[in-house]
Amino acid sequence: MSIDYEVVYQGKVSARLESRNNKRNNGFATMMQQFNAKKYLNKRMKLSAFIKTDKVIESTGLWMRVDDKYEDILQFDNMSNRQIKGTNSWNIYSVVLDIPEQSEVISMGILLNGSGKVWVDNIKFTNVDLNIPSTNMSMERNLLDEPINLSFED
């Protein structure tokens, strides 16, 4: 992770994450911040940034998570359903999450899975209207009403 003065979208600097080619492409890097959710309770917040990539093999993207005081995840999006791969020019990306009343902590950043380079610039965290759809990745499970096949014969 470093500051880059040459590859920028706007202004004088961008941030760069880089993972060198290695035999195991299962590593990841993240640049993140974590802060108190109190100021944002009952709001819909959008994390947006301009992202540029070079030879990203696995994926990269923004991510945001909202936790309660027990560190349970209330809202989450890591763009895994809309991954950025390969080599791409500057483009704007965003994640949008609701900040429920019981929220305590907001974590957010950019993630690089596998090898490649990613630059991020012009990051914004803004309150948006409810007509902007949430990108929350549902963590709900569809549970059965009762146990089944306890004899393993069905």
Positions of predicted regions on the chain:
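Extracellular and organelle-lumenal recognition/adhesion modules and their flexible linkers in secreted
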Residues: 1-154
